[in-house]
A protein has these predicted regions:
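Short, well-ordered coil/turn segments that N-cap beta-strands
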Residues: 9-14, 35-38, 67-73, 106-109, ...
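Short, well-ordered alpha-helical microsegments
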Residues: 23-26, 163-167, 227
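Alpha-helix-loop-beta-strand connector modules within alpha/beta enzyme cores
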Residues: 59-76, 135-148, 227-235
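Active-site acidic/histidine proton-transfer and metal-coordination neighborhood
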Residues: 67, 84-177
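Acidic/histidine-rich catalytic cores of soluble enzymes
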Residues: 39, 140-223
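Charged helix-capping and loop-helix junction motifs
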Residues: 53-60, 89-97, 130-138, 190-198, ...
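Active-site beta-loop-alpha junctions enriched in small/polar residues
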Residues: 17-21, 42-46, 78-82, 116-118, ...
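N-terminal pre-domain/capping segments
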Residues: 1-98
Length: 235
């Protein structure tokens, strides 16, 4: 029998992603529940019409595993889409809705969404959203909202190579929340503790990961003072 070694910090709910080991959803989650009280179910690739998403049978099995282990869920929505055109925005919105409807059975506290015009990473800083892009995204969010248990359950994530105020108009114009990706801010050479007081009223959850040549690495790569600067204000 595996001895649990859950990461717990007073005052914070610590989680992990659904793939701390390279395996399919069900065996991977069976491993995750030994280490965290909150699991981010990664549904990053939906495909053209949702064919790449997790199956309803897998969702039912994950619900049982989580209930037995007493863990909670958040869901990272598909990232293989964007709002570059009306057509791409329509397809992306449909897949976001598919993913939300599929995972409602898990009763996630948050669904995390990327808001991009081009989902293929590039080396340059993205420009601010145009008025037309903003209107397109707001229409999409209006379509997504009825599928949520509450509007604030949808959290828009800040991304690297995007201006820090990229999401400001969207957050202020909707009842949705922020997912504060701290690692993305570090990756841009900025100080997340300076953004925290500005964004805190809208933050629903945070992504915390280290940097070592790239992001999404162990926090062991980060200096203690760097971690303290952002974590202490949260306590």
């Amino acid at each position: 029998m595996k001895t649990p070694h859950k990461c717990r910090v007073p005052g914070l709910n610590i989680g992990c992603t659904s793939f701390i080991i390279p395996d399919y959803y069900v065996p991977a989650i069976r491993e995750c529940v030994h280490y965290a009280d909150d699991i981010a179910l990664l549904l990053l690739e939906a495909g053209e019409h949702g064919e790449g998403l997790i199956t309803p049978a897998e969702i039912r099995e994950l619900a049982g595993i989580a209930a037995d282990a007493g863990v909670k869920w958040n869901v990272h929505l598909p990232t293989d889409g964007g709002f570059a055109t009306e057509e791409s925005g329509r397809r992306y919105t449909e897949n976001i809705i598919r993913a939300i409807d599929l995972t409602r059975e898990l009763e996630p506290h948050t669904w995390v969404m990327h808001v991009v015009t081009d989902h293929i990473p590039g080396p340059d800083m993205r420009p601010h959203l145009t008025e037309r892009e903003t209107e397109r995204i707001l229409r999409s969010l209006e379509q997504i909202t009825p599928h949520l248990p509450a509007p604030e359950c949808l959290a828009l994530e800040n991304l690297e190579r995007h201006p820090t105020d990229y999401l400001d108009k969207l957050v202020s114009a909707t009842p949705h929340s922020r997912c504060f990706d701290i690692g993305h801010v570090w990756k841009e050479g900025l100080r997340p503790e300076e953004l925290l007081p500005l964004w805190l009223p809208d933050i629903r959850m945070c992504h915390l990961h280290g940097l070592e040549k790239r992001d999404h690495k162990s926090l062991h790569h980060m200096a203690a003072a760097t971690l303290d600067a952002i974590l202490h204000p949260m306590w």
